[in-house]
Amino acid sequence: MIKKLVSHLGEYKRAAILTPILSALEAIMDVLLPTIMAFIIDQGIEKGDMNAVVKYGLLTFLVAAIALLLGVLAGRFAATASTGFAGNLRDAMYENIQHFSFSNIDKYSTAGLVTRMTTDVTNLQNAFQMIERMCVRAPVHLVFALIMASMISRSLTMVFLVAIVFLVAVLAGIMVPTFGIFDKVFKNYDNLNASVQENVSAIRVVKSFVREHFENEKYTKACESLYKQFVHAESRLSFNNPAMLVSVYGCNIALSWFGAHYVLNGAITTGQLNALFGYIMNILMALMMLSMAFVMIAMSAASARRIVEVLDETTDLPPAKQPVQQIRDGGIEFEHVTFKYKHGSGQPVLNDVTFSIRPGETLGIIGGTGSAKSSLVQLIPRLYDAETGSVKVGGVDVKDYSLDVLRREVSMVLQKNVLFSGTILDNLRWGDENASEEECIRVAKLACADVFIERFPDKYNTWIEQGGSNVSGGQKQRLTIARALLRKPKVLILDDSTSAVDTATDAKIRKAFREEIPGTTKIIIAQRISSVQDADRILVLDNGQINGLGTHEELLKTNKIYQEVYNSQTQGGGDFDKQGGEQ
């Protein structure tokens, strides 16, 4: 795991290498100061030699200045390395996420991925900076301080060793169980982020149903769960400081008692005793720094594992060894296709589905909620892979195509319409970034979007808020249809993409499709029979299986479900789910 993370240092390796070197040199300078102070006392003050006081005083100033300079440089390089490291990690994670299939995203959830790229990376950045400085500086401090102290008095140095053993035992007892607690803490961060993301993105729905109180309670529960886990972890870590203070005071008392006897017996000088007190603080401060570093490591270990999980995740849509780079036509074939979601119930949502669509044909798909309409069409651009059987486009299995080529030629308007912050032109050019304004206007007319665009003061330069919050549902649907058309695809899939459009506009869009893009294979998923009755054929899905396939007239004669839906919609304005949906 560490090797995987360190490999993302990239151009910041130099700063990462210089930081511990400079920190080690800074620690050595610090360790020299108590010994120099001992010379000032023994050679200068006690002997009344002001020249010695000035000489060693200047040496103290010089060593302190060098230590300060080294510390500043180490801090600067540490900040550069840790910030750059975090940036590289986020870039690598983001790039890998871009290659995730829908199944990979289902595994982690959007909120979980956001937490890993923000909170987890920040934790690792802070830990890396602390490790770079403290986990090098503290051991060097500790080792050299022990060496200098033992040069003064080996027997008195045993006081330090007892304190070190005590602290290490206490810290180990605190840290080991804390690692598991922080795993739970960051899972609670995922839940908290999910609650915030869901609430903010759906704030209009929350307010329209007066559900603010319910959402506040849900958020409060997520906060309380995170709070309890964090308090549990911090309550264990709170033993660090008391253990440190016990060691400091114990060492001071022991050194005062035994040191006084050594001075009186002439075994050591007053200056050397003063130096030993300095080394006590050096050693215990080094241990304090190590304990702080261990706290950060405990917190970041869970974050590091979660980050590596994302970095190691590979798409479950393996690329073809020799990918086909061109799609012949928009013909589609499903051959005994069975499909289930990896992170779902484990039950197949499509069972042994077999049918074909001719190039340029318009196929309507109708079915109740949960009949797997969306699941079916998502296999065509290979958003998911079929469990068994094959899906072919242009006579070639979709698994044999380059994904870029396949998705460029199979344009899909998803059930959930998404617009991005930017102008209308910016959003349309998601279909083709090099499209001219004239081409954008043409597809907008095909999707009947030009009607409302022309009413805006800035027309095609009108700013769209994030998620398209400043346009209506029907306007959003028409813009996403226009965006898909801009790709000039061989296959166009509309996944219930005209549900918010009035029937007259829906009819105009279908007419434009027939007249302007007759060579494009069109698949239209809808709840309204009026949206699909003019299709060349209509597929009736029920519980993941084909219940009927034929023209509008044929299905009215032969398919019971289709008959019931048609009658309910023409007589009482019902929908598929009210009659013959999932019976």
Model-derived segments and spans:
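Transmembrane helix-loop-helix hairpins at lipid-water interfaces of multipass membrane proteins
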Residues: G10, A16-L73, F77, S150-S155, ...
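An intracellular "coupling" helix at the cytosolic face of ABC transporter transmembrane type-1 domains
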Residues: E11-R14, H99-S103, T119-E132, V136, ...
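Alpha-helical transmembrane segments of multi-pass membrane proteins
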Residues: R14-A16, L22, V63-S82, R133-V140, ...
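Hydrophobic alpha-helical transmembrane segments of ABC transporter permease domains
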Residues: I21, L25, M29-L33, L58, ...
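Juxtamembrane helix-loop junctions of ABC transporter transmembrane domains
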Residues: I21-L22, M29-D42, V63-T110, V114, ...
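Short intracellular "coupling" helices and adjacent cytoplasmic loop segments at the cytosolic face
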Residues: K47-G48, T83, D91-T115, T119-V121, ...
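Helix-loop-helix
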Residues: D49-V53, F144, M148-V165, H232-R306, ...
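ABC-type nucleotide-binding domain
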Residues: Q325-Q583
